[in-house]
Amino acid sequence: MLTALLLLPACRAQAAQAVFAGGSFWVMEALFADRPGIERVEPGWMQGESRLQRRQVVRVHYHDDRLSYGELLRLYWQAVDVFDAGGQYCDRGTEFSPALYVDGPLQLKWARQSRSQLGLEWGRQPEVRIFAVGRFEPAAARHQQYYQRHSLLYAAYRSVCGYPDGRGFSLPPLLAGSRVN
């Protein structure tokens, strides 16, 4: 019994996951990487309804005792053009269209509520779709940490394409008691 109780805190330390599509996975990886509470960010692909339909995404591994899914959503909403369902900035097509991939009813609730709140604030509904998490396929090694390994090329691409520089975006704290895993 004592052994089981001692193992409980270790189980809690596992990272939660969230999946975001917001155009180029290079840009999304740079947005979430190197932030407190985020363990790692993996660029990759999420399979769509058909075999030929997939989106560039990032899978964010985070510590839900230090950072909530709601806080990740707030960062995401700052970085994407929520009214452009045809892609993001200069990257066009379904592959680059914004979407949230939710894992369970709590993430679904937060995704829907935050999207609705954005719609109320802007006076029109965001074009960001919400799907259940599907099969994640990691991007090839050449795409991993592209923003770090090719920093000058990445900065030029991001700037020419029109993506905002996410380093200036902050994670505003949520209201006390509203933390959701």
What are these model-predicted stretches?
Residues 1-9:
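Bacterial N-terminal signal peptides
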Residues 11-181:
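Flexible coil/turn and secondary-structure edge motifs
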